[in-house]
From Swiss-Prot:
Catalytic residues, chain numbering: 21
Keywords of this entry: Cytoplasm, Hydrolase, RNA-binding, tRNA-binding
UniProt protein name: Peptidyl-tRNA hydrolase
Site, Discriminates between blocked and unblocked aminoacyl-tRNA: residue positions: 11
Organism in which the protein naturally occurs: Prochlorococcus marinus (strain MIT 9301)
Protein family according to the UniProt entry: Belongs to the PTH family.
Any single GO BP term: protein quality control for misfolded or incompletely synthesized proteins
Pfam families recorded: Pept_tRNA_hydro
Length: 198
């Protein structure tokens, strides 16, 4: 039985539930619900966890409860507990440097300034894990200044218009993840990176 570990990044709690920074949580909750699997809190993994099978693959889903900037502690706990090879891990994360609705699947790379990815890299001492980045668009400029209002943007709630776009994105990503056992990874990477929600 093959095992796939999907880790969505976000912040726990109602205050942050529908924020742009919680894209990873929202996508994995949608996937878990599709397979009638509930998330259960596991303190030793510092995460809420869900598990189900698709054909001969076991999908294990995790929502860290460490808050975004400490995501690496949860990922480290998951890797240590399950003795996971890093190539089995997929991190689902928001990206303010991508236009809303764009997807980027990479097998490895730097944090790109994302604190959740930075924490994971620090804890794993490696950049060699897969990540699916979902664009939330650039933050607006602060009126009268040359600075971007990044914190308000990433922690702000997803609007109805954004949700309509992200629903299409989530559907595309979920369909690709479901075919990890039938399609070559290169094909899935090309599918996601060329996705256009229009």
């Amino acid at each position: 039985m093959h095992e796939i570990y999907l880790i969505g990044l976000g912040n726990p709690g109602k205050k942050y539930y529908n924020s742009r920074h919680n894209i990873g949580f929202l996508l994995l909750e949608k996937l878990s619900k599709k397979y009638n699997s509930n998330f259960l809190l596991k303190d030793k993994l510092k995460s809420s966890c869900s598990e189900f099978q698709i054909n001969n693959y076991t999908f294990r889903l995790f929502l860290p409860n460490t808050f975004m900037n400490n995501s690496g502690y949860a990922v480290r706990a998951i890797v240590d507990w399950y003795k996971v090879n890093l190539d089995q891990i997929f991190i689902i994360v928001d990206d303010k440097d991508l236009p809303l609705g764009k997807i980027r699947f990479r097998r490895k790379g730097s944090s790109g300034g994302h604190n959740g990815l930075k924490s994971i890299i620090e804890q794993l001492q490696s950049q060699n894990f897969k990540r699916i980045r979902i664009g939330i668009g650039s933050p607006p400029l602060i009126k009268g200044e040359n600075n971007f209002n990044t914190i308000s943007h990433v922690l702000g709630n997803i609007s109805l218009e954004e949700k309509l776009i992200l629903d299409k994105v989530f559907k595309r990503v979920i369909e690709s993840l479901e075919h990890l056992n039938t399609k070559k990874e290169d094909h899935i990477i090309n599918e996601l990176n060329s996705f256009n929600q229009d």
